[in-house]
Amino acid sequence: TTESPSLLRHSEVETLFHEFGHILHQTLTRAPFSRFSGTAVERDFVEAPSQMLEHWAWDSDVLASFTRHKDTGEPLPQALLDQMTKAKNIGSGIHYLRQIYFASLDLAYHGTNSITDSDRLARELHEITSFEFPENTHFQAGFGHLFGYDAGYYGYLWSQVFGDDMFTRFEKEDPIDVGRDYRKFILEPGGSKDAETQIVDFLGREPNNQAFIEEIGLDISSD
């Protein structure tokens, strides 16, 4: 408005970083054919670069470089970021159950069995969430990823495992050097190489889910 600027929630900042991850993937490609350029990779890898970049939306130095209080001009206080980080995984169990439900429903709708009652299938699979099914809402009619992203919604979770694992290199090594490798091994090839090969080339090892498990706040250590 004329009296107040447009402000971003932190979740919207995360989304900005996420989409910028796709932009980098698309603009820095050096694939020899357009068919395999940029984000033209396997559907269950395409979200890995974008979700990896979301980690920077939680980095104190990055946030301090551009966040400002609309009245005082002060950057985001470290104490506030610390509290945000502590609260990051509140409700994460519900979030991931919801994601698993959406992915399962997407795969079921686009599976080999003929579907004549979309509500019935949505109701049956809703047990995954442990919540009561909201009758007469027909939420699937507004589930945009069912169209154009068909049978690929599971790729968000699958890609997050890769994205979290790739970020571990940035945490452990000089981010400038790692960034060069990231550009060379992940962004430049596009779909001209198998995603699994790209990940191994970048990490120097087979990927695993340890970083993902830690990122979502699970403790799977044995007593």
Language model features with spans:
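Short pre-active-site segment immediately N-terminal to the catalytic Zn-binding motif
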Residues: 1-17
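C-terminal, non-catalytic "cap/extension" segments appended to globular domains
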Residues: 16-19, 23-32, 38-47, 52-59, ...
